[in-house]
Each structure stands twice: as structure tokens, then as C-alpha cells.
Design a protein with these regions (language model features):
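P-loop NTP-binding module
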Residues: 1-226
Length: 226
């Protein structure tokens, strides 16, 4: 066994005492990223009452409603890890089926996993509603970035919930399908994908059957949750 001990000592001298990530035991805990300090991102603190009124899972300690989104998170994270995905779209066949609430609460559930930061983008440019889910009035967002060149740093909002940030939809536009399929939107998605390696991107998209927006945007995402 001496040769094994000698080999181990030689490995430590060459590489340090830490075992490479690929040789960690499968059950070893993943490293937790340091906490994020939001300096340039606008922060809005939500009260517990607001979170409960808006049916955000962070306003409840438990129950079937919260558990359902945690189960969905487990399935989504599993698929993302297996396939190397980090860009998800959330849609519904028709309006008023709860897609925005699903996108918001899935994003919050994902942000509870300390291995990830989550950015939710309101890409329903015909009927933006993510800001309403946080009890906020209309505010500039994706539209202003694409058409008015407002920097993202001035548009992102951190609602005081963990490692979660969202980009509002901004003002309503008529040519939303063209905007989502535009080269500028493609550049934005690529930038957001690569700016933070541990970040998951979630896009709240328009209903699938009522507009052409989703079909033009699908090439930019890894998976679509219907």
C-alpha cells in the first residue's frame, strides 16, 4: 500500500489537498455561492401580506400550493442538469390560465436553491404582467431596453427575495412577435446566458395559440414549459 500513499502525497504536492470536482463523491454537497449584494439593481422590499395576497410561495411557510412548485422545481433542475440547460420559457395555450403566476413562483422556487441565481424576464410584450405579481405598478423594462436602449442595470428589479431578479415587460407594443424574433433580442438572450454561469433564465412568454410570438422566440430557449 506504500505506493498508493506515495501517489496521494505526490498528488497533494502538485494539485493541493482539494479533490477535483469530477472526483467528488456523488453525495458530496455542492459549494454554496457567496451572497449577492445588489448595488446597481433596484431593490423593492415586499411585505408578507403582499406576498400572500399575490400568492407568491415566499409568503407561505408550506402547504400543497408551495409543495407543488417545489416538486416542479425538482423536475426542472433535474432536466437542466442532465441536459446542460439554463434558459426556460413558460407559456400556456390560451390567456388567463395562470402562466405568469407559474413563471413567477417557479422562478422563486428555483432561487431557493442556493446553487442558482434566477432572472425572470417578462417577455409577454403584448400583455406584461410580472410586475403585477409583485404588487407593482407598470414600469419600464424589456421594451425600453430593446427600443430605447435603456441599460439593463436601470431596469432590473430585486424584490428582496433571495437570489432572484426580474426584468419587467415595460410598455405594451403591437409588434411584439417581431421584437422577440429580432437580432437585438437574440443578442440580449446570449448576453444574459453567459454573464453569470450559475444563473437560470426564465421567460414569461405570451400564450402559444393566440399570438405568433412564441414560435419566433423558441430558438432562443432550451425548453418550454406548457
Amino acid at each position: 500500500m506504500d505506493y498508493l500513499q506515495q501517489g496521494l502525497e505526490r498528488f497533494k504536492q502538485e494539485h493541493g489537498s482539494e479533490v477535483p470536482p469530477q472526483r467528488r463523491q456523488a453525495g458530496a454537497p455542492r459549494p454554496v455561492p457567496p451572497p449577492i449584494v445588489y448595488t446597481s439593481t433596484k431593490t423593492v422590499e415586499l411585505t408578507d401580506e403582499t406576498m400572500r395576497t399575490q400568492r407568491l410561495i415566499t409568503g407561505f411557510e408550506g402547504g400543497a400550493f408551495v409543495d407543488a412548485f417545489k416538486m416542479l422545481r425538482t423536475q426542472v433542475v433535474k432536466q437542466c442538469r442532465q441536459n446542460g440547460w439554463n434558459v426556460l420559457g413558460v407559456t400556456s395555450p390560451t390567456p388567463h390560465e395562470g402562466k405568469t403566476l407559474t413563471a413567477v413562483n417557479l422562478s422563486l422556487a428555483l432561487a431557493m436553491d442556493l446553487a442558482h441565481t434566477v432572472l425572470l424576464v417578462d417577455a409577454d410584450m403584448h400583455r406584461p404582467a410580472v410586475h403585477q405579481a409583485f404588487g407593482m405598478d407598470s414600469c419600464p423594462g424589456l421594451t425600453e431596453h430593446l427600443f430605447d436602449e435603456v441599460p439593463l442595470e436601470q431596469l432590473l428589479i430585486h424584490p428582496g427575495i433571495g437570489r432572484f431578479v426580474f426584468l419587467p415587460g415595460g410598455r405594451v407594443i403591437a409588434n411584439s412577435a417581431e421584437a422577440l424574433a429580432s437580432p437585438k433580442m437574440a443578442v440580449l438572450v446570449e448576453e444574459l446566458k453567459h454573464r453569470y454561469p450559475a444563473r437560470l433564465l426564465v421567460f414569461d412568454l405570451p400564450p402559444l395559440l393566440s399570438r405568433a410570438d412564441v414560435l419566433g422566440f423558441v430558438p432562443h430557449i432550451d425548453a418550454l414549459l406548457l
